[in-house]
A protein has these predicted regions:
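An N-terminal alpha-helical hairpin/helix-loop-helix interaction module that forms a charged
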Residues: 1-120, 137-205
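Helix-hairpin-helix
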Residues: 115-132
Length: 205
């Protein structure tokens, strides 16, 4: 990690936004993404007892993808079509993957989900990491491919190579590095993990 670049980015950020992500100048962006409201919806829609109904879980998955500003308009209808095409067995597996991601063995859930999505050409970092991020925005990271590649290059994150196919191995290694970076800056920047990676993205412009 290039700590000098990170601290310089922090200083520049506070020069424009003295209150960090609580600064009024950033409110329009925060309102547009509405992560807090969607996060509360995800907590309710994906509560552990809801997983007794896999059909409902996959429909809720599609709903959150449609609502989210983090997913491209191009991918949203593809996810809706995927859910319509799925057999009951595939819906069960997607539901199991989401349960493991949120409540069980995260590595297994991650790989199962990537495998299911791959059958429909949708094994995308953004889609795999969306629900876990909304469910726990302080501990889980939303992974956006271009931003991720730029962060690795700009902040000199060595011994890690980005690949388009989502894997838990990369996710665990990359997010550990992000946590180390987050620990080096003010809590006014690092509370919401998408906000933190947004801060890093702004630093690279």
């Amino acid at each position: 990690m290039n700590l000098e670049k990170l601290k310089e980015a922090e200083a520049n950020f506070f020069a424009f936004y003295p209150k960090g992500f609580e600064d009024e100048a950033l409110l329009p962006i925060i309102k547009r993404h509405n992560t807090e409201k969607i996060g509360k919806s995800v907590e309710e829609l994906f509560a552990s007892e809801r997983f007794q109904n896999p059909d409902e879980i996959v429909e809720n998955f599609s709903k959150i993808v449609s609502k989210s500003t983090l997913i491209s308009l191009f991918e949203k209808p593809k996810v809706r079509d995927m859910i319509k095409q799925m057999s009951m067995e595939q819906k069960d597996m997607l539901s199991i993957a989401l349960y493991e991601l949120l409540y069980g063995k995260k590595d297994q859930g991650f790989e199962i989900m990537a495998d299911i999505l791959a059958r429909y050409g949708l094994a995308k970092w953004s889609i795999v990491t969306l629900i876990p991020y909304y469910y726990d925005r302080e501990n889980n990271f939303f992974i956006k491919p271009n931003t991720t590649k730029d962060i690795i290059k700009f902040f000199d994150l060595h011994d890690i190579v980005y690949k388009p196919r989502p894997t838990y191995e990369f996710y665990a290694k990359y997010t550990k590095l992000l946590e180390e970076m987050k620990a080096q800056v003010s809590p006014l920047i690092g509370k919401d993990n998408a906000g933190f990676t947004g801060f890093l993205m702004m630093a690279m412009k």
